[in-house]
């Protein structure tokens, strides 16, 4: 059984462009999400000796140097790369094979037909009630129900326990959370344009940043 210290992982940051449809080799129309993945760069390699674990820090998205604070600017200078807007770490056992300043491309990291996981931030829906947020059934439309058809109902007992239990599903802010979709198939790769076509939907709105990695639970 592989652990986080022995497992080899690959991952890249990209931008969700939207959804479209493509035909496969069997003339079946496949819905796909288009993810733009311009080359990521390695900004730091973490080792057990220096950091206690193996990992690769990657960066994505150009940003004006004037908008970067001095500690971040020094970090990018040490890696020999221009400042980038987004950073993330990939825990992988083969981190020693990477070097600071190395470019990682979509065609060099993924291949058509493999399974990937996509991590993103779900669309924000604002303040939502329990029927929309938690799929509650609501209150009866008749039989004495009066102006409370979409209310949650009771949220706890009276004298015992005289409180509302933690985790009670109630109305509140919906969406805007980190979501991971597992085992999506890479339908196609356009290396020239830096595009990754993934079968199905991925979290987030158009233009949002997503993290694509090889499937951790894939067959």
Curated annotation (Swiss-Prot):
Where does the signal peptide begin and end?
none
The region called Disordered is annotated at 140-163
Keyword Lipid metabolism listed? The answer is no
Q: Which GO terms describe its molecular function?
A: rRNA binding; structural constituent of ribosome
Spell out the GO cellular component terms annotated for this protein, sorted alphabetically and separated by semicolons: cytosolic large ribosomal subunit
Which UniProt key words apply to this protein?
Ribonucleoprotein, Ribosomal protein, RNA-binding, rRNA-binding
Q: Which GO terms describe its biological process?
A: translation
InterPro entries referenced in this protein's UniProt entry, alphabetically: Ribosomal_uL3, Ribosomal_uL3_bac/org-type, Transl_B-barrel_sf
For the keyword GTP-binding, the answer is no
Summarize the subunit comment: Part of the 50S ribosomal subunit. Forms a cluster with proteins L14 and L19.
**Family to which this protein belongs:** Belongs to the universal ribosomal protein uL3 family.
Supply the NCBIfam families for this chain: L3_bact (TIGR03625)
Function, as annotated, reads: One of the primary rRNA binding proteins, it binds directly near the 3'-end of the 23S rRNA, where it nucleates assembly of the 50S subunit.
Which protein are we looking at? Answer: Large ribosomal subunit protein uL3
Q: Which organism is it from?
A: Leifsonia xyli subsp. xyli (strain CTCB07)
Q: What is the lineage of its organism?
A: Bacteria, Bacillati, Actinomycetota, Actinomycetes, Micrococcales
Q: Which gene encodes it?
A: rplC
